[in-house]
Amino acid sequence: SNITAGKQQEGATCGAVRAPYVVTEAPPKIDIKVGTNWKKVLVDTGADRTIVRYHDNSGIPTGRIKLQGIGGIIEGEKWDKVVIQYKEKRIEGTIVVLPSSPVEVLGRDNMAKLDIGIIMANLEEKKIPITQVKLKEGCKGPHIAQWPLTQEKLEGLKEIVDKLEKEGKVGRAPPHWTCNTPIFCIKKKSGKWRMLIDFRELNKQTEDLAEAQLGLPHPGGLQKKKHVTILDIGDAYFTIPLYEPYRPYTCFTMLSPNNLGPCTRYYWKVLPQGWKLSPSVYQFTMQEILRDWIAKHPMIQFGIYMDDIYIGSDLDIMKHREIVEELASYIAQYGFMLPEEKRQEGYPAKWLGFELHPEKWRFQKHTLPEIKEGTITLNKLQKLVGDLVWRQSLIGKSIPNILKLMEGDRALQSERRIELRHVKEWEECRRKLAEMEGNYYDEEKDVYGQIDWGDKAIEYIVFQERGKPLWVNVVHNIKNLSQSQQIIKAAQKLTQEVIIRIGKIPWILLPGKEEDWILELQIGNITWMPSFWSCYRGSIRWKKRNVITEVVEGPTYYTDGGKKNGKGSLGFIASTGVKFRKHEEGTNQQLELRAIEEACKQGPEKMNIVTDSRYAYEFMRRNWDEEVIKNPIQARIMKLVHDKEQIGVHWVPGHKGIPQNEEIDKYISEIFLAREGSGILPKRAEDAGYDLICPQEVCIPAGQVRKIPINLRINLKEDQWAMVGTKSSFASKGVFVQGGIIDSGYQGIIQVVVYNSNDKEVIIPQGRKFAQLILMPLIHEDLEAWGETRRTERGNQGFGSTGAYWIENIPLAEEDHSKWHQDAGSLHLDFGIPRTAAEDIVQQCEVCQENKMPSTIRGSNRRGIDHWQVDYTHYEDKIILVWVETNSGLIYAERVKGETGQEFRIMTIRWYGLFAPKSLQSDNGPAFVAEPTQLLMKYLGITHTTGIPWNPQSQALVERTHQTLKNTIEKFVSMFASFDSAIAAALITLNIKRKGGLGTSPMDIFIFNKEQQRIQQQSTRNQSKFRFCYYRVRKRGHPGEWLGPTQVLWEGEGAIVIKDKNLEKYLVIAKKDVKFIPQPKEIQTE
């Protein structure tokens, strides 16, 4: 049975978990006399022992007793034969003295003797509600080894962990719970140790919960109250049990000091500090616990954020305090402690960084420090600005110049220059802060939010009476949003703030005219806006007049559209050389506007548009708030224009006499090759044909033909014909296109006829480039007359082209690339897939697109077999020693602790043992030029040269290798638990998976060169060591006479080859029939 486990006194590491046992709905407290003292105790049928905080030492002490609760074991003092009196009844009973208990309890041991019984109600309600948490799909929990700690830290940790275990916060983990999270500790100013847990990996793998509370409560949302009390919940997290199925993932290891014994493994039973869900679980738990209490006390204004509780009321002071006590008792039932020393009664009260006064509120620290002209470090500037941003809800001042000053160099020690304009901006904020105070909310009155366009920011004021703001705020510019759209975003933010803080929907006052805003809401994809809004004749600075009739810096787009040769066409030609045209149905006016829309879509932030349509020109110039736009093309253009920085609009009459306008008119008037459908890809300038796309997965059995219609109709010009051709990558696999001429004027669907010549089925996947369409000019020559009257037999049975795929290798290449992120060339060579397919795989890999490789640095460095370069590089806070062999590009790298000579020499011996190098180039770093390093190089026989100072070319190869290595490591850091593993994976990619122009990897080249050296040395050695022997030939198993001497031409493990002079044949002789001898003298003299 469970015992009520209390809290430790102040200064303890953490409190105990209270047992979630059953209690009555309103737990009864009764007066009993224990020894000589009267006490108000909780009658608790869930506790089997009676607990008091203090005792007068009457009765018989029987030593210490361990109480087992859900939170673990707590020790108290046990006293027998203590006189206990309830009303008239006196008994002798047993009590436990536990000074840290939040409440004193009469347990079942003495209740029966005193004849006390209670009727239970809502039996399960006072358990602490458990919030379910889980890992993300497919995750297995953290497995990060505990790093070594000093003896002193281990002793500090042991003391903390022992205490946690005794109080039931942690438990001993069974051996099959294998997860591990590292722990460490720091010393506080008081000299006590504080335990820290590195939950980063567990946090990554844990499924998020919704935030229980969005943002801080704000005093502007509070009503004015006579009395106020602020309570602080002590050891909040450590009072809430952790969901049991999740506990195995929270294990940590307590190393034994000096390795004198085995490690001890623990797991968390309560919400640990530093775990990402502790705040959310805590908030959900408090919501559940307090919901009923808040509902029963409507006269109380109640606010909670994490462990700070605000209670405000207009009751008389005695009643107010009684309710506060009631709340404290209610929370204490669940084991939460409310330390007396942190309780604040009455004004001024400090809450969440605010200072609450009877009529107003202000910030606790409401003066900003001065800033003076001169230099300031970025670190100090960030702190100052942070101080101000916190207070913007009171003063609403934006500081664009100071914010601009923070841009640039990110190093905290980098310096910034404060000028007079910055000082003035800051002083304005200081003055405003000194003058202003916030007001409380009156629920009888409406709430207004007024928005205005300030200096590079939008400011808004929330008020009920003019001049008495509840709060104000600033929303800074959002890139790529027009100012009007930004004002709408600010209105949404303001409304959400008011709803969260006050629970009412505000009236929003917007600058300008109502019609403008109706239009903005229509074209801006605004999904939600408060229904109560109005406009005031204030500033209309939001009107971003970015359409002008002057020339703008930027390219010029000549646009045109209309019915040309009976067909709707539109397009543009830009001064940059970009051209665009398209067939589309529509009126002349619609097509003119569509041409402008396409130019706006494809043009930059600043551009010029030239049109010969007066209608389109007037539309672009018109003040768009004059009417509500109903034409969807106009609305789309307005949306595009709002997002531009500036557009110059120009009108020229007709197309006569103006070369550029004539050009665009002619360009869209041509009967041009038009297409319909998505079965074709745009052609690059260097390609002969257009790639055709397979519409769905197609299986072609061995030796069979398939006709594949693709999603494409084309309209060839009269002087064109086309051919559907095979792609060489398909032909090389035995898959061919049969036929494929498309006659001029043909307008049918393109079909590709494919023949599989293999003896097994071939699959062409959907979306694969599998044929190409080649356009040719039509030349009739002598056959022109016949050509005019020719007939095409094909009708709708048109032809297209192909190129087939062996396909099985594509998924293999994709899978291998997801592991090693090699380049397209390497995939192409390793898996025999076309270069374009390999490039597609790399382009679709998000990791590779984020981490582009550096371009090659070409220098005149010395390169050669077994000649290496070495240097240190830094990745975040880690140091890596990088070696590169200059001939093959083979890289060797390891993480090091520092750039010391001793560590470098240890690494040098490792490097030498692995690669047997001959020479080394480094810069003039102290580790490289130290005398012991030079002596080691001589000892190993390595020729060591140092770079030419300030000549980067001398180290170009290793410098480029740094960049390549770091880019590759970046791809692997998230895939591996340890950084060293990420380095190793990067080396596999760069040394083994990366193929060069000849299809060889750095490792291939390095091994080949080593083998060549070995063969060369062996042949040299063999030439200088001829061997001679006597031999005998066996006939039917019987050995013959000894013959010779003769030269051994080849020697194996069990036999040799010689040439028999008599037979003029080469013979293989077993070694048992051979006697080796030194080189005979007479042969030497020959």
UniProtKB/Swiss-Prot annotation:
Residues 551-673 form the RNase H type-1 domain. This is Pol polyprotein. Gene3D superfamilies: 1.10.10.200, 2.70.40.10, 3.30.70.270, Acid Proteases (2.40.70.10), HIV Type 1 Reverse Transcriptase, subunit A, domain 1 (3.10.10.10), Integrase, C-terminal domain superfamily, retroviral (2.30.30.10), Ribonuclease H-like superfamily/Ribonuclease H (3.30.420.10). During replicative cycle of retroviruses, the reverse-transcribed viral DNA is integrated into the host chromosome by the viral integrase enzyme. RNase H activity is associated with the reverse transcriptase. It comes from Ovine maedi visna related virus (strain South Africa) (SA-OMVV). Residues 1027-1079 bind DNA. Pfam families: dUTPase, Integrase_Zn, RNase_H, rve, RVP, RVT_1, RVT_connect. One of its GO terms (molecular function) is RNA-DNA hybrid ribonuclease activity. One of its GO terms (biological process) is nucleotide metabolic process. It catalyses: Endohydrolysis of RNA in RNA/DNA hybrids. Three different cleavage modes: 1. sequence-specific internal cleavage of RNA. Human immunodeficiency virus type 1 and Moloney murine leukemia virus enzymes prefer to cleave the RNA strand one nucleotide away from the RNA-DNA junction. 2. RNA 5'-end directed cleavage 13-19 nucleotides from the RNA end. 3. DNA 3'-end directed cleavage 15-20 nucleotides away from the primer terminus; 3'-end directed exonucleolytic cleavage of viral RNA-DNA hybrid; dUTP + H2O = dUMP + diphosphate + H(+); DNA(n) + a 2'-deoxyribonucleoside 5'-triphosphate = DNA(n+1) + diphosphate. The gene is pol. Cleavage sites that yield the mature proteins remain to be determined. Keywords: Aspartyl protease, DNA integration, DNA recombination, DNA-binding, Endonuclease, Hydrolase, Metal-binding, Multifunctional enzyme, Nuclease, Nucleotide metabolism, Nucleotidyltransferase, Protease, RNA-directed DNA polymerase, Transferase, Viral genome integration, Virus entry into host cell, Zinc, Zinc-finger.
